Structure formats: C-alpha cells, structure tokens
Amino acid sequence: MHPLAEYPRPAMRRDSCEILNGPWQYAITQTAEYPAAWQGSILVPYSPEAPASGVNRTLQPGQWLHYHRLFAPPAGEGGRVLLHFGAVDYACAVQVNGHLAGGHRGGYWPFTLDITDLLNGTGRNSLWVAVQDPTGHGTQARGKQTLKPGGMFYPAQSGIWQTVWLERVPDNYIQTLTVTPDYDARTVTVRVHTAKPGGAVNLWAMVRAGGVTIAEDWGSDEADQDGEVTLNIPEEHFFPWSPDTPFLYDLTVGTNQGEKAGLDTVHSYFALRKWSCAPDAHGVLRFCLNDKPILLNGLLDQGYWPEGLYTPPSDAAVERELSEVKALGFNLLRKHAKIEPQRWYYHCDRLGLIVWQDIVNGGSAYNLWFVTYLTNALQPLLRRFPDGKACRRLLSRAKPAGREEYAHELADTVQALRCHPCIACWVPFNEGWGQFDAGKAVEAIRELDDTRMVDEASGWFDQGGGDVHSLHNYFYPLRIRPQKRTVALSEYGGIAWPMPGHEPPHKTYGYGTAKDRQELTARYKKLQLKTVLPQLEKGLSALVYTQLTDVEDEVNGLFTYDRAAVKPDANAVRSVNAALAAEFARVTNPAKK
C-alpha cells in the first residue's frame, strides 16, 4: 500500500496513474555523484527530517540527498510516459536509466518530465533523483523553515515531500488546462495547450451538474497547439458556490487534431462564484461573495504535521481536519508561508472552506530585530515603512537574482492554484519578510488573475495598494477606522496553552499563556466578543485568529499539534462564531438604523 495513494491532481485527472510513493533507497553525500553505497530506506514522500520518513536526518546546505528506485511504466502501449513530482525542495536533477531526464528549482511547485525516450524494454527502469536545499543560506522561497528552529520558525525539511507518479498519455496530450468561470455571464471558458505542434486543436468540453449533462460544445480551431471553448450554464442549473453551498460542476475535456479523434481526455471541475470588495448598504467597504457581504472568519494555518512536517499522514487526516474547522463555525483558512498539495485545495473546494493564499516568503537572512520585534513594538509608527530600492537590504532583498526568483515563484503559485474556487485572496508579502516593490507584485498578480482579491502586505510595511487594509495585532488595543480598502485583521490572538499530554518537549511559545482549558476558553471568548465583535460595525470584515494548530514549540493553536483534541471548549468556539456571524449580519442589514 502506497502512502498518500489518492490521485494527486483532482483538477486535471486521467485514467492512467501509477503512484511511486513508498520505500526508496537514499543516501546523503557531499557530492552530486551517484552514491557509492545506499545508506538505507526512506518512505517517499516524507522528507528525511520528518519522523515518518524513517530517516530522521537533516540535509545541510552543500550536501546532496540522493533517491533511487526501480519502476515499471504504466500499463498500456504507445503514447508518452510522464513522470510527475508534486514538489521537491529545493533543486533537483532526475535521471532515468543513467540518462538525464531534466531538473527543477523551487521547493513548492509541481513539475513534469517526459521520460518516454529513456525507458528500456525490460520493465525494470532505474530512477535517480539528486537534491540540494540551501534553506536559509539562499534567497529562495522557504516559508517558516530554518536549520535552527524555535518560536515562530520551524524545522527545515528537504527533498521529495509530495507525491511522485507516472502517467501514460497520447502523443499529443493536453499539457495545460485553464478553466475560467464567469459568474455574471454564467459561462465557463476552457483553454488547453497541447504538447505537439502540427495543426490547430479541436477542443470538446462537457459540463455536468449532479450527474446530468447541462452543456456541451466544440470550440473553434485556434493557433497551433491551442484550443478554446466557452460554454453557457443554463439558468435552471446556475448553482453559485459558497461556504454554505459549495457546489462543484464536473467538467470533461477532450481534444483531437486533424483527422485523429479522441487524442486526449481529462476530467476536472469548477465553481461559479465571484469575489469583490464593495460598500454595504451603509457605505462601509466589505468583502463580497457573489455580490453579497460576507464575514471572512478563520484561522492561520501553517500546514505542519508532527510526523510528516510539510507532508500530512494521510488524505483522510487532511479531510478530517478541514471538516472539523467547518464544524467549529469557521469559513476561512489563511494558508501561511506554504503551498499545499493539490488535494488539500480540492477538499477546501468541496467542503466550502475559503482560502487566503500566501506567496511563500524568501529572501536572504531576515533582520528579525527589525521586521518582527521592533516593528511589532512600534507598529503604528512603522506601518507605512517603504519597500523600495533604498530599503532592500534592510528587508533582505538586496540580491537581484533573489528578486527575479521571487517573480517566478509568484507566477508559478498563481498558475498552479488559480483553478481552485476556494482561493479568494493572494498575499504576496507577510510582515516584511523578503518584501520589495509590493505595488509591482500586486500588478503582476492582477495580470495573471484578476478574479481574486490581493492583500498587498499582510501585517505591516503597507504601501497602500491591493484590496485589503491588513492588520496584525497581538499587543495593542484594537481600533478600526474607515479605510479606502476593506479592513482585515489578518493575524491576532495567539493565546498559548500547552495542553497536558500534548505539550512540546522543549520550551513553549505564544502570545500570553493560559493556565488551563477554562482560562483559555474564557480569554478566547473575551477577545472575540468584547474586543473583536464591536469592530465589525466600524468596518472590520475579515478575521484570522492565530492559529489552527500548535506547531512544534508554538502552542497557541485551537487544536493540538497531533490534531487529537480541541484545546478550548468546542461549544464555546461555535457559540462565538455564531455571535460574530449574527453581528455581521446585523450591521450590514439594509434595515439597520
């Protein structure tokens, strides 16, 4: 049985899939050369630093992590064989049967290699992957990873940490699928790019709702390798997506080219929903879903697991955690400093959990005394600190190559995740970590995706752009004032309590510590009902409490790190969320005086 054996890419599915997760050979060496001897077994897709890998070793900058296994191609004849990696942190080279198949840089994004011409006819093929990861010694995106964990920064992880899989496809297969729903027009536009030149692509698409075909059409011929078709959704089958009704349409897409029919077929899904920022009935700017004001009420989600670090123990564990978040009355998760496997977003799409997605932070080593400690203490004075050329060294972005790399990372993130209806907002920068030219980052995001909101600079170093006036507040009295952008409290709370039986083995970290469950519950209720709730009438429209779970030393989660228990009283949390929703409905009601 493979770990994480579910189909890894729900938004672009084919029938052919061979999962390569499981035991591989590994070695950690000082060179890129093929290892003289293998040092043991590693359970892919868990990083060697993760207990679940069976290795429990930390890859150091300058070292090489080598993987090896034998494999057979997927069943079938002809076509092409693709090798997919969900994510490898950070830089890797891949060889098949002793020949270079390709490589990749970037620890959070999927990549695909066509290995057809490197396969032998015996059914026993050799796969070797060599990885390096500089962690904090480079400028690449790394999130909360550090080689010296503690407090708000967590253990580094490296190598293969998402599913590896094979797929047999036709010669001229669909390389990319872009699905763009239009809520106002009640349409969905499907665009494909195919692998092989040689004539215009004929594209066919079919939409089903509840098992019934509701739209089907052929697209007009497009330029070489491209095809596009727009389908109209009948009014009687118009089912808007929301947290209460997360309806997903099934989509099937097929292509042919010239006289050849049925070259490739993929299955996907989409939702009809619309995000905007607009005044409510009283002229106060609000986040709107499907043209109606909505209170975004959620949790900061770091995406760490005790046994797998970045990698969850199972797909069922992910689904269970997200379902429990909804059961507590939350409708939002801010995915913080990490990108998840595609199935995480699929479950959010299906369950109706809204996501604010961070662009993973990078840059050279941070001046934490400035961007975190001093700024937190003097936030009102430093909130509008500039992020232009003169300040790049202070904000860890002095290196041109690092800034160029960030531009690619931003584009890769939006392109990889834009298919997921759950995502409502992109967050290019958090608390000044590697921040630079935030206004240009907003422009770059809008060019790639103009259907979602942008929180230009979460916390501080606000340059006045994007859609969100974004506040982090752990220490100051909360006073919301009218703004020209919609107001979000994008981090707050963080009340710590190391729950007996679940506490970390080392020191604990948080923002004020409760002595027991009763005190934690009382402090949580007081913060939400006495401090936060009155600010809804003044324009507060989104809440992100810190945080979903305990993480390593940081014990300020609503859930324990192992997800075994809710730390405050669960009924009290549900009651608080119901009160917040009721107050938001009251203050946005046109009949309110």
Explain the meaning of each model-derived region.
Residues 168-198, 281-286, 579-592:
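Surface beta-strand/loop "capping" patches
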Residues 1-53, 130, 134-139, 160, ...:
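Accessory carbohydrate-binding/adhesion or oligomerization-edge regions at the termini
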Residues 113-118, 230-246, 529:
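Signal that preferentially marks extracellular ectodomain short beta-strand elements
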Residues 177-178, 252-325, 579, 583-586:
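N-terminal carbohydrate-binding accessory modules
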Residues 6, 10-11, 25-30, 57-174, ...:
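Accessory beta-strand-rich segments of carbohydrate-active enzymes
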Residues 94-96, 186-221, 229:
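Beta-strand-rich binding/interaction modules
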Residues 332-577, 583-589:
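Substrate-binding/catalytic cleft of secreted carbohydrate-active enzymes
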Residues 126-129, 245-256:
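Short, aromatic- and glycine-rich surface loops/edge beta-strands on solvent-exposed regions
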